Amino acid sequence: TWLAGGTGTKGHVVLNVLEDGKNRLSVLTPSASGWTTSAFVGAPSFGIVGVGDVDSDESDAVWLTVTDYLTPTTLSLAEIGQPPEQLKSMPAFFDASGKKIEQHFATSKDGTKVPYFLVRPEGLKYDGSNPTLLYGYGGFEIPMLPGYSGGVGKGWLEKGGVSALANISGGGEYGPRRDQPALNAHRPQA
């Protein structure tokens, strides 16, 4: 878990935290008794999120950019405490209806929990017969985040395939302390 960014508005601070390979937005609000924390209304469960203030001197509005495995990059405007209003979107290159994003955790030999994302058709039977495209990367503290790919969507997901992305050690999703034990001779533990 690490701070990926944040912004201030007239009455709040919005923190963008990378947690288990996905962004999570939190709203911090000052009061006479200290700060309170709440979830950002309408933030996606899985995806890459960018947040920036519109005019921090005058309003509590923020710009949001969001993308995930099934959603091309979108630009939205949100007032703190209200759901975002989508303003623009990049074109969709495949039909994402009937598809679902999930996150699971595998356990490595040393007991480390390794998050992975699964993009699959709804109603999928877990019987081992589903063609699956698995990608895992962990190096140079470069995180693999949930992003949109028209090629994977059109060429694989639309045809009923399953896509999996593993956030293995080394990718920086949990910082250098998590990555160090999986270097050199210990790389198979990743």
Task: Provide a role label for each language-model segment.
Residues 30-33, 79-81:
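Short loop/turn segments that connect beta-strands within beta-propeller blades
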Residues 1-7:
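Generic long, charged, amphipathic alpha-helical segments
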Residues 10, 39-190:
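Serine-hydrolase catalytic core recognition
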Residues 14-21, 28-30, 63-69:
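Beta-strand C-termini and the immediately following turn/loop, strongest in propeller blades
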Residues 1, 34-43:
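Trp- and S/T/G-rich repeat-edge/linker motifs of beta-rich repeat architectures
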